[in-house]
Amino acid sequence: MTDTEVLRKDNRYELRVDGKVAGLAAFLDHDNQRVFHHTEINRAHRGEGLSTVLIEAALTDTVGAGMRIVPVCPAVKAYLEKENGFAESVDPVTDEIFDWLEAKFQKR
């Protein structure tokens, strides 16, 4: 059995397996919304169900912080389509959100 933990660091949640980074869920906060725009699991750990562990922990932390979830990332969106426990905390992805994200990334 592998030891996993999910930690929030800056604008991402890191999934650690046996103390090493194995994946991340990246986000940017927009007012009271946490906009998830990218999720990634390292190749060595794909197919182990770790994206579910990562996304569930990230969404639980988001809701616990009083933030709304905006699932731009396809992996987060797919998770939410299967798991309805977060339905009341999800905001739709709008053109305004896409424009805001684009502007944020152009500044980097």
Regions found by a protein language model. Name each.
Residues 2-24, 33, 60-108:
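Terminal substrate-recognition subdomain of acyl/acetyltransferases
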Residues 25, 39:
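Conserved GNAT-family N-acetyltransferase fold
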Residues 29-37:
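A conserved beta-turn-beta hairpin within the catalytic core of GNAT-like acetyltransferases
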Residues 36, 50-53, 71:
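Generic alpha-helix structural propensity
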Residues 40-46:
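A short, internal acetyl-CoA/4′-phosphopantetheine-binding micro-motif in the GNAT/acyltransferase core
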Residues 47-59:
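Conserved acetyl-CoA-binding loop-helix of GNAT-fold acetyltransferases
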